Regions:
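A conserved ligand/cofactor-binding region detector
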Residues: 1-181
Length: 181
């Protein structure tokens, strides 16, 4: 290693370790928010990948996932499992969007235990797209398709569609993602 390579290797190792060393970091600054988002994604991704791996070991296919597995989202923090399951089905197992969406929506369920706005997690969309670009792409597509369906059902009712949208005013609304997924 040259000094530059060694320093970079140590920085990468420290970045990887911090994910599990600091639980619930302060999120009153960008670094804390990025760490918290990274932690949430790390835990969701590991969980969904484990579920998929176990399912594949038993059944060897994923088209029957909703018949054998139920993933219940009990808070807004793990709502990233919706786009993460989509990512795995599309990117790793070559499902079409429609096939992946059908499997995802039949596998996921969500219970909300509060209606207090401050308890319904949101993320700054630019921070989100910086940290999780592929997940952001998937959420944008989910949102676009959902808003089109909402427009078809409630033509001209922008207020209603805006209230239900995942992406709004530069924010990613996790409860809306969980409900739609």
């Amino acid at each position: 290693f040259t000094q530059g390579q060694y320093t970079r290797a140590v920085e990468e190792s420290n970045s990887a370790e911090i994910i599990s060393k600091v639980l619930y970091p302060s999120d009153n600054h960008t670094e804390g928010k990025l760490l918290r988002l990274t932690q949430q994604y790390f835990l969701v991704s590991a969980s969904v990948q484990s579920i998929i791996r176990d399912h594949m070991a038993v059944y060897g296919r994923l088209d029957n996932l909703p018949d054998k597995v139920a993933i219940h989202i009990n808070d807004t923090h793990p709502a990233l499992c919706v786009p993460e399951l989509m990512r795995i089905l599309i990117d790793d197992y070559c499902f079409s969007w429609d096939q992946a969406w059908d499997i995802t929506t039949r596998t996921m369920s969500y219970t909300n235990h509060t209606v207090m706005p401050e308890a319904l997690e949101t993320w700054n969309e630019s921070l989100f797209s910086f940290r999780l670009p592929r997940i952001h792409m998937i959420i944008k597509e989910i949102n676009e398709r959902f808003c089109k369906q909402a427009w078809d059902k409630f033509p001209g009712n922008w207020s209603r569609i805006t209230n239900m949208s995942i992406l709004c005013n530069g924010m990613v609304r996790m409860a809306n993602l969980a409900v739609i997924g």
